[in-house]
Amino acid sequence: MKNVIIDLQIASEDATNLPSVEQIQLWANAAIRAENSQPEMTVRIVDEEESHHLNLTYRGKDKPTNVLSFPFECPDEIELPLIGDLVICRQVVEREATEQEKPLMAHWAHMIVHGSLHLLGYDHIEDDEAEEMERLETEIMLSLGFTDPYIIEK
């Protein structure tokens, strides 16, 4: 299996308690499972202001969110290893981890896995899609040594 190349951008004023690029790569690898290519993705860690702006601009939601996924769409005749960008809001991830009583790094891992699956084309708009995506997320998180990220909801 080939490693996902991670371009980590930290655009948060507070860079403490963030996962390392190696951790992010491990979590993304588990979700993407690249066999024949070496995919590349950007992970941008931002503050609430940027997350809010992007969420409003691209999803019409007037609030910050935990993770936004921007899949890279390339013309069929061009082969590039880019799969897309993840934008993750530090404050939202920290707040959710506290509210859900989860270890912070487990929640960071879940956001990387969740966002990576979106980059691969998975979605959770329809119930059947949501069930499949949650099943995959749980399987991947367990393989990484974390607990089921949806345990509080089940």
Curated annotation (Swiss-Prot):
Its EC number is 3.1.-.-. Zn(2+) binds at residues 114, 118, 124. Keywords: Cytoplasm, Endonuclease, Hydrolase, Metal-binding, Nuclease, Ribosome biogenesis, rRNA processing, Zinc. Single strand-specific metallo-endoribonuclease involved in late-stage 70S ribosome quality control and in maturation of the 3' terminus of the 16S rRNA. It is found in: Cytoplasm. The lineage of its organism: Bacteria, Pseudomonadati, Pseudomonadota, Gammaproteobacteria, Pasteurellales. Its cofactor is Zn(2+). This is Endoribonuclease YbeY. Belongs to the endoribonuclease YbeY family. It comes from the Bacteria. It holds the Pfam family YbeY. GO terms for molecular function: metalloendopeptidase activity; RNA endonuclease activity; zinc ion binding. Binds 1 zinc ion. Signal peptide: none annotated. One of its GO terms (cellular component) is cytoplasm. One of its GO terms (biological process) is rRNA processing. Disulfide bonds: none annotated.
